[in-house]
Amino acid sequence: MAAEPSGRRSRPAAIAKRHPVLIRAVAAVVAGLLLFGSFPPRPWWFLAPIGIALLTLSVRGTGKLRGGFGYGLLAGLGFFLPLLPWTGIYVGPVPWLALSTACAVYIGLFGLMARLLGTLPGWPLWIALAWTTAEWGRSSFPFGGFPWGRLAFGQADGWFLPLAAYGGAPLVGFAVALTGTGLAALVVALRRTVVAPDEVDRATTDAGSGATEGAGSSGSGHSDAAGSESVHGNRRRAVVTAVLVIVVMPVAGLMLRPALPAPDDGDSTITVAAIQGSVPRLGLEFNAQRRAVLDNHARRTEQLADDVDAGRAPQPDLVIWPENSSDIDPLRNTDAAAIITRAARRVGAPILVGAVLVNDDRTTTNSMMVWTEESGPGPRHDKRIIQPFGEYLPMRGFFRLFSDYADRAGYFVPGHGDGTVEVAGIDLGVATCYEVAFDRAFRDSMSAGAELLTVPTNNATFGDSEMTYQQLAMSRVRAVEHGRALVVAATSGVSAIVAADGSIQQQTELFVPAALVADLPLRTSTTLATRLGAAPEWLAIILTAGAVTAVAIRRRTRHRSEPTEQTSSPGLSSHPSA
C-alpha cells in the first residue's frame, strides 16, 4: 500500500528520464507560446517570467552546447511565429517565416549562453544578463536589427513598467528575465527539497558509511546526521534565495510606481490634436486612390475646426497627422499643398504632416514636416531608421534571385537629424512608426531637448492584426522611459494620447475617423534612463561576454583533461545529453 503513491510520484520523473529530449523540446515550445501570450492586445504580462522560467529549465544543463541552442531555437519559433504573422498578411508567408526564424536564432544563442552560464554560482543573474545581451544582438544585427518582441514591450500593463524610467527597455527586460530565472531556480531548489530528498539523503548516507567504514557505529551515525543537516540547510537557503530573486524586481517596480510623474505634471502645457483620417482600403494599396488618404485627414481636421468654432473642442496649438497622411508628395503636387494649407488655416494651428517625398535621384524619404498656413512646409523629420525588406531591400540583386518580392520593396533612404522638429514654440521628439522600437530614436530626441514625444504611424498595411497594439505598447514604454507625454497618430488606428506614466488617456478605434484633443504637459527634466542612455545595457553585455568567455575556456580545459566525465544539472531532465 505504501509503495503505490511513491510509484505514482516517480512516474513523471521516469518519463522524463526515458524521453529527455522530447520533454525539453515540448517545454521550450510552450515557453515560447507563454512569451507570446504576454504581449498585447492580451494583458497577460505575468506570463513572460513564467515563459522565461520554463525556457531556462529547458536549456539549462551540462550537456552539449548545441542542445541549448536547439531548445532555444524551438522556444524562439514558438514565440515569434504567432507574434509576427502580420508581416506576411499581404505579401505571403515567406517574409513572416524568414523573419520569425531569424529572430528565433537569437533565442537559440541565448539557450547556448544559458547552458554555459547555468553552471556558475548565482546562475539566475548570469542567465538574465544573457537574455539582455541576446535582445541587444537581435535589436542590432543584421541590417540594423529587429527589436520587436523585446520583453519590455509586453509589460506596458505590468508591475515592471516603472523600471523603464531608471534603465529603459533593457532594464525592464532584464527584470522580467531575472524574475523568470529566479522561478527556475525555485523549481530546481524545490525539486531537490521536495521531489527527491531521499535520493540526496541516501547519497549522503552512503558517502558517510564509506568514509567511516570500520570506525564504529557511533562515529558513523554522528557523521551521517551532520551531513544530512548540512544538506537540508543548503536546500533551505537555496529556496529562500530563489524566492528573494523572484520578488525583488516586481516589488521594486511597484514601489517605484508612485514616483512616476502624474499625467498633468509639467512645466507648462500645450493643446495637441491627433487626427486619424482612416484609409479607403487596407493593405499595400491603401493609397492607390490618388489623394484619398490626404482628403480623409484634411476633412477630419476641418471637422475638428468646426467643433472648435462651436465650442465642442478646445483650440489646438498643434495638430499631428500620421505617417503617410498625405499619400502624394505635397512638395511636387500643388493640389496636395493647397489642401494642407487650407486645413491648417481652418484649424488655426500648424500641422505635422506625414508624406513620402520623392528625391531628385528618384529615391524616396519618409518625412514628417511642419506645415503652416503662412509659409507652408517648414522643419521636418526624415525617418532615420528605415525598415529593411519593406522600405528598402538590402542586397536587392541577391534576393531577386529567390523571390519577386524583391521588386515590391521600396527605395527609401534614411534621413539625418536629431529626431526633433521645432513647432508651435516647442521641441517635439518624433519617432516615425518602426523607429519607436529602437532605443536610440527617442534617446537622440531627448538629447536634443524634446519636451513632448510623438509616434506618427501608418498601420493600414497590416490590416486589423495585433501589430498596432504591439506598437502602442512600445510607445507607452517610451513615455515612461523618458518621462514625457506622447501622442500616437495613426492613419487607421490605433491613435492614442499617452501620459508620462504610461497610462492611456484617450484612444481611438480601428478604421474610424477620429480626432483626439488633449492639454498635455511639457517637461524639461529628464529621467535616470535618459541620462544613463545605453550604459546599463553595455554593462550587461560586457559582463555576459566576460562570463561566457571564462566558462567556455574552463569547459574546454576540463573536457580536454577529463574527456569521459559528464554531469548534469537539475532541471526538466537529468539526462546528461539533453
What are the roles of these predicted feature ranges?
Residues 561-578:
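Cytoplasmic C-terminal tails of single-pass
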Residues 39-54, 79-84, 276-277, 313-328, ...:
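Short, conserved active-site loops that position catalytic residues or coordinate cofactors/metal ions
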Residues 256-389, 420-424, 430, 434-436, ...:
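Soluble catalytic regions of membrane-associated enzymes that act on cell-envelope
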Residues 90, 128-129, 318, 326, ...:
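CN hydrolase (nitrilase-like) catalytic-core segments centered on the catalytic cysteine
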Residues 204-228, 563:
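Compositionally biased, intrinsically disordered low-complexity segments enriched
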